[in-house]
Amino acid sequence: MEIVIRTGSGDVRGSKENGIAVFRGIPYAEPPVGAHRFTAPRPPRPWDGVRDATEFSATAPRPPYPEAIGALLIERFIPGDDYLTLNVWTPDPNAVGLPVMVWIHGGAFTNGSGSEPVYDGAAFARDGVVFVSFNYRLGIIGFADLPDAPSNRGLLDQIAALEWVRDNIARFGGDPGNVTVFGESAGAMSVCTLMATPRARGLFRRAILQSGAGNMAVAAEDATTIAAVIAHRLGVEPTAAALAHVPVAQLLDVQQQVAQEIQGAPDPAVWGERIAGGSVLLPFAPVIDGELLSQRPAEAIAGGAGHDVDLLFGTTTDEYRLFLAPTGLLPFITSDYVTAHLAKSGLDADAAKAYTAEGRGEEPGDILASIITDQVFRIPALRIAESRVDAPARTFGYEFAWRTPQLDGILGACHAVELPFVFRTLDRAASLVGTNPPEELAETVHNAWVRFATSGDPGWPAWNPETRSVMRFDHPVSEMVTDPYPATRALWDGVPL
């Protein structure tokens, strides 16, 4: 059954699927092609007639994941240039005032799309939510800092998508005044950035941060260095005008080289002392440009930004095992390597003993995975919560602790494992969660997200600095936990991240 809705740019034709109206590939901006590859998003050109919105659009250009991780996180690739589009699942286009949830996908700002099978919005629509997902520009195209182009184009795309929601979602039954924006990993970092920038103020009422916070921003001087190296390797000037003529495949090749070098052992002769010293973890990420961002998002939030936005935040128990376990590196990590990492991170060598004492690792590889889980994910998220103690809006915390049986159980409750539980798409993620994950846990997690988007209350007490209580999701029992892993949390007090 076909359904036609009039948007601000023209009519779109969706389809009725199991009682839910679904619209795919609706443009929220013009395709970023040719001379417009690096420009700010432009409003979609109005069209005559009815535009088909029954199939997903192209996905943003991105390289493949490393093989070991790509076997777990399956990506959908759809070729084409018209990829600044969004998708809508609605229980009833004729309804009035339904809560809206807008999903921002993760992928280190270089991978992912809004059309991945695990992000199917049908379960949210079945529970009375108008669900929206979208694509945004990634990698060099979205985040390389160039003097003749706006910075943070990927973020500008996200804002443009949210503005489309504000202007059009009532036509799909949604309430533009009750929007929850949520994301995972780089998507959660994006949400935190949107909370921090005045440009997005008023576009959403609630936010959910899944495994990402507000400390991943690139300093302007580092962004300039990265752009210069990219251009040098491509044999062009470090400008948008020059890079607009470089084939996308070449951009992606250099993008992969740059990411591997910066995340490995960057040569100071190439990258300078700052980047070689670890100033950049994600080379393509929000840039502190003085316009969209004047400081790191975490600092802006500590100063009061986004304090009127209800917040649900959390992490998985074993985040970093996704990046260590599949590669086979865990058994080869030595105690000396752990000690060196602790020293570089500003912690004493004895910190490793605290991780073992709290049951967070016996072997060096397991200890390192827990240390980096805290360093990159858990502690930055907790600092966001701590900075909102006096906020008028409420803050809620969670920990996702269910351990996947995949790879003989060595992944644990790794990064991204909660996604099919949030979306109730367990059958789309067997590579990550196996063939018999607990559906009851998916129902529990998903329902909490729906409750939060509907009312601002996921169903458990708000986070506070006295108890630091969070909901620990696990099977067969999910329960409130007071101050998880307090000793290792305290190790990071005062340590810059």
Curated annotation (Swiss-Prot):
Catalyzed reactions: a carboxylic ester + H2O = an alcohol + a carboxylate + H(+)
Active site: S185, E319, H415
UniProt-recorded Gene Ontology molecular function terms: carboxylesterase activity
InterPro entries, alphabetized: AB_hydrolase_fold, CarbesteraseB, Carboxylesterase_B_AS, Type-B_Carboxylest/Lipase
Entry GO CC: extracellular region
Pfam families: COesterase
Enzyme Commission number: 3.1.1.1
Predominant cellular place of this UniProt entry's protein: secreted
Family: Belongs to the type-B carboxylesterase/lipase family.
Protein name: Carboxylesterase
Source organism of this protein record: Thermobifida fusca (Thermomonospora fusca)
